[in-house]
Design a protein with these regions (language model features):
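Structural signature of tandem alpha-helical TPR/SEL1-like repeats
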Residues: 37-46, 71-84, 106-118, 145-153, ...
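Terminal, low-structured helical/coil segments at or just beyond the last alpha-helical repeat
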Residues: 167-174, 182-201, 342-383
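Structural marker of alpha-solenoid helical repeat scaffolds
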Residues: 54, 87-89, 122-126, 161, ...
Length: 383
């Protein structure tokens, strides 16, 4: 495991054990706690094993046994211990996080991603330290899975709290340049490019945002690697964050010269053109994006909005329904679909979409940005 996110000192306690227990079990439980607090790890592991054999329903015992084994890099044994916590559904959340970490360390990346998604669905439970470690590894796996924006949403709060850190810089660089690698296995000749992008992304994520330093690193990235894919698109997104739409559009068009089928750049330009009410150009770009990737939800969303603006309601409904199918957690899609249904006289469907929009917007108001984005991931992964 990586240095910053290496060892977890667990201070998370599950529900207390039953009040009435056999004397022998009670003795073992106290001895295990003493060994753990005195950092006599081998003794603590042995005693927690003995205690869980005497009382298989001992949740604290399984928790501490799993966490101690995890800190000793004994990941398969830790996994087996944490599995016992799933008997009690009220404590699944932290166990999901640890199972994800264990599977990550043993190279079972798809299983780890599934466990982290389950953890998100269970409410992101755990100590601050556990959440930091789990969110970091979750983000790495999202990058590996090609979900770069969602990965950055998870990493950004860590960057705000922890500041400059080489692991976060590397992770943000990979996601920013849309490289589906884990930090330990990308080609070494790409190291500087990833580092420059990561530094720019990290400074842009700070609170308050340090766009001056972000632009400095982005300019260095572009001057050295401006002929490489993803560099101009990344710089365009930075300009977009800064509110510099003209420069953002210029960078997106530069990206299309290098990668004519770059779907995110096509979608970004289509969105900008629609904001300027250039529907014809927006439609052309969005249709190009759909032709390259028919599962790009935002391209269908944009086409639906264009058809709506042109009063072609049936075409708008078809595109927005496709967008909803691909991204059911996007509140704006639901809002635009409600508008179309209302204009078509489909009153009940319009109300259902309006209710869904309000529910999703209310959820956004009470959840941090990574949570709302990753709830969408969980729903999409179920399809």
């Amino acid at each position: 495991m990586r240095p910053l996110f290496s060892v977890l000192v667990i201070c998370f306690s599950l529900a207390a054990s039953a009040a009435t227990v056999p004397d022998h079990f009670e003795t073992i439980a106290k001895q295990a706690e003493t060994a753990r607090t005195q950092e006599r790890v081998p003794d603590a592991i042995r005693l927690y094993r003995e205690g869980t054999k005497l009382r298989p329903s001992w949740e604290d015992g399984w928790w501490y046994l799993g966490s101690l084994l995890y800190d000793q890099d004994r990941f398969p044994e830790a996994t087996a211990a944490f599995q016992h916590l799933f008997v009690n559904t009220s404590h699944r959340g932290p166990a999901y996080a640890f199972l994800g970490l264990c599977n990550f360390e043993t190279g079972k990346y798809n299983d780890a991603l599934a466990q982290f998604r389950a953890w998100a669905g269970a409410g992101w439970a755990g100590t601050r330290e556990l959440r930091d470690v789990a969110e970091y590894h979750f983000a790495l796996l999202l990058t590996r899975d090609g979900r770069f924006v969602e990965s950055l949403y998870l990493i950004a709060p860590l960057a705000q709290r922890l500041g400059e850190n080489p692991e976060l810089v590397e992770a943000m660089g990979l996601a920013s340049l849309r490289m589906s690698y884990l930090p330990e296995n990308y080609p070494p000749e790409q190291r500087e490019r990833i580092w420059l992008a990561g530094k720019a992304a990290l400074y842009a994520a700070q609170s308050p945002k340090d766009f001056e330093r972000a632009d400095e690193y982005a300019a260095r990235l572009e001057s050295r690697y401006g002929t490489q894919p993803e560099v101009h698109y990344f710089r365009g997104t930075l300009y977009g964050f800064e509110g510099n739409r003209t420069e953002a559009e210029r960078e997106y068009r530069e990206e299309l010269k290098i990668s004519p089928n770059h779907v995110p750049a096509l979608v970004a330009l289509a969105g900008s053109d629609l904001e300027k009410d250039d529907r014809a150009e927006a439609s052309t770009l969005a249709q190009r994006a759909v032709a390259v990737d028919s599962n790009e939800a935002e391209a269908h969303h944009l086409l639906g909005r264009i058809f709506l603006a042109n009063a072609d309601l049936h075409a708008a409904a078809a595109e927005l329904e496709k967008a909803k199918q691909l991204a059911p957690g996007n509140p704006l899609i639901r809002s635009h679909l409600a508008m179309v249904y209302s204009k078509l006289g489909r009153t009940q469907e319009a109300k259902a979409e309006s209710d869904a929009f309000l529910a999703l917007k209310n959820k956004e108001e009470v959840m941090e940005s990574p949570r709302e984005k990753l709830d969408e991931i969980n729903r999409e992964s179920a399809h």
